[in-house]
Swiss-Prot record:
Ca(2+) 1 binds at residues 56, 58, 60, 62, 67. One of its GO terms (molecular function) is calcium ion binding. InterPro entries: CALM/Myosin/TropC-like, EF-hand-dom_pair, EF_Hand_1_Ca_BS, EF_hand_dom. GO terms for cellular component: myosin II complex. It holds the Pfam family EF-hand_7. Residues 7-42, 43-78, 83-118, 119-151 form the EF-hand domain. PROSITE patterns: EF_HAND_1, EF_HAND_2. This is Troponin C, isoallergen Bla g 6.0201. Belongs to the troponin C family. The keyword Repeat applies. Troponin is the central regulatory protein of striated muscle contraction. It consists of three components: Troponin-I (Tn-I) which is the inhibitor of actomyosin ATPase, Troponin-T (Tn-T) which contains the binding site for tropomyosin and Troponin-C (Tn-C). The binding of calcium to Tn-C abolishes the inhibitory action of Tn on actin filaments. The lineage of its organism: Eukaryota, Metazoa, Ecdysozoa, Arthropoda, Hexapoda. CDD domains: EFh (cd00051).
Length: 151
């Protein structure tokens, strides 16, 4: 379960608990198909049986939370860094209306506000000040990437 990000474990726990109606710490393997469909994956019965056999290590016909996470982690698409960078480049391009390679700090402020409606004006000011250290009022793609990925 180490490879699953903590926030996804929380979501998986909620889903697991929703299917664990009797609150006994396990769910029936018959629910697996339904759960996978909810995660956006549809499998034929043979494939489903094969996955269940692999994941239900103790052959109990029930999945404990740990087994459920093992199963779910196979279908949680972890975006690789390259795909993420591509998506962020596209987003940047959309906001860079003049195509000059930068956006204004005002536009960045709007983007950040859209991403997190709970962010305060003070937090925004601090972030913008940190990003736009030269006070130019603009942000290039590298600076934008730094903000969006925290790297």
């Amino acid at each position: 379960m180490d490879e699953i990000p903590a926030e996804q474990v929380v979501l998986l726990k909620k889903a697991f608990d929703a299917f664990d109606r009797e609150k006994k710490g396990c769910i029936s393997t018959e629910m697996v198909g339904t759960i996978l469909e909810m995660l956006g994956t549809r499998l034929d019965q043979d494939m489903l049986d094969e996955i269940i056999a692999e994941v239900d290590a103790d052959g109990s016909g029930e999945l404990e939370f740990e087994e459920f996470c093992t199963l779910a982690s196979r279908f949680l698409v972890e975006e690789d860094a390259e795909a993420m960078q591509h998506e962020l480049r596209e987003a940047f391009r959309l906001y860079d209306k003049e195509g000059n390679g930068y956006i204004t700090t005002a536009v960045l402020r709007e983007i950040l506000k859209e991403l997190d409606d709970k962010i305060t004006a003070e937090d925004l000011d601090m972030m913008i000040e940190e990003i736009d250290s030269d006070g130019s009022g603009t942000v290039d793609f590298d600076e934008f990437m730094e903000v969006m990925t925290g790297e």
